[in-house]
């Protein structure tokens, strides 16, 4: 599969994970008090910075034609993992109420 097709596939999957992540973040945020909302926002910003640095590292390491597919895969995988983490957390908070 050409790199451009790999990137397009990863981007489509990441769009799905972005949707799950955003919905889970919204659900979790609605269930928290103001102090916890601020901490959630700080955590999410730190996660985004970490995700970006991790994926930039792969980009720098692979370089050439493999760099862009690798960064697309990295962003997709990281977004999926964070989406599942937030969804699990939101589900747990909902069960406790």
Where in the sequence are the language-model features?
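N-terminal alpha-helical modules
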Residues: 1-97
């Amino acid at each position: 599969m050409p790199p451009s097709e790999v990137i397009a596939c990863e981007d489509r999957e990441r769009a799905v994970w972005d949707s799950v992540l955003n919905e889970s973040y919204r659900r979790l945020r609605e269930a928290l008090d103001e102090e916890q909302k601020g901490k959630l926002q700080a955590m999410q910003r730190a996660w985004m910075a970490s995700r970006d640095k991790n994926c930039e590292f792969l980009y720098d390491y692979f370089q050439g034609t493999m760099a862009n597919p690798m960064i697309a895969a990295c962003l997709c995988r990281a977004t999926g993992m964070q989406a599942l983490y937030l969804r699990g957390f939101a589900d747990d908070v909902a069960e406790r109420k």
